[in-house]
Amino acid sequence: MNVNGKAGMLDGVRVLDMTQFEAGPSCTETLAWLGAEVVKIENPKGGDAGRFANTEKPGIDSFYFMQFNSGKKSLTCNLKTDEGVALVKKLVKEANVFIENFAPGVVKRMGLDYEALKKENPNIIYASVKGFAEGSPYEDFLSFDMIGQSAGGVLSITGEPDGKPCKPGVTLADTGTGMLMAITILGALYRQQATGEGEHLQLAMQDAMTQYSRLAYAYRDLNGKAAPRAGPRSFSPAMPPMEFFYVNRAEKMTMYSSLLHGQVIVIGNGFAI
């Protein structure tokens, strides 16, 4: 992919994308934006399930699907047949990255797990996006965005102090996990230049949400209790005041100009313009 007339930063990198919905596709879309050739492998009977999620009109790809799959190529392949599995293994020989976000155990049953594909291409970077990490008591469970946010603690610190836990307006567990996996893949590609070796990368939604919530976990360690919900404010007393305030607009531009060019007001040990 060319960007502004120049080859992308990942020009020459080929990614086999066996992901669906959002957590995986948001990762591979990012790699496509950076110039990688992303080949999306889809079920011949309907393709990625996200193609028809909230479809605005029958017979066309949904807006949801298009938001997470721009810049990709698509290939249909029946993974329930020996021929389909053989095709994927053939494609892996010429790929740099393979990524999947199937339910736990699915790729192994298909014969497309890391150990199987490593035999086809010892240098393959194999990325797995899951809900929960290996060794977790929930490792065999499925996960979608709201589950990932709940398990990672995001919902517990979102909402009003006297209200229920609240889901943020963005799909943080899905796209947030995808972005972290994209960064991890970039690191693996960089290391591969030095070592020539591939590896198996694994990232769980729960772990990603824990990473995004690390200030809340630090609060718990410092105060001996869980960080509270604080609405638009901060749960930390060390943070400056923050909230939504209604203000009247300046009636004349001269008033606004005077404000912008006003004197420095000293506040405690700091200052504000």
Language model: regions and residue ranges:
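N-terminal Rossmann-like NAD(P) cofactor-binding subdomain of oxidoreductases
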Residues: 81, 100-156
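Conserved small-residue-rich beta-alpha loop and adjacent elements
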Residues: 7-47
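A structured beta-alpha segment of the ubiquitous adenosine-cofactor-binding alpha/beta core
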Residues: 2-4, 16, 62-119
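Glycine-rich phosphate-binding loop and adjoining beta1-alpha1-beta2 segment
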Residues: 33-74
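Structural scaffold positions in well-ordered secondary structure
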Residues: 15, 31, 72, 99, ...
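Long amphipathic alpha-helix in the N-terminal Rossmann-like dinucleotide-binding domain
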Residues: 33-38, 123, 146, 211-213
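A short, aliphatic-rich alpha-helical micro-motif
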Residues: 10, 89-93, 141
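Acidic, glycine-rich segments within the central catalytic cores of soluble metabolic enzymes
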Residues: 7, 151-273
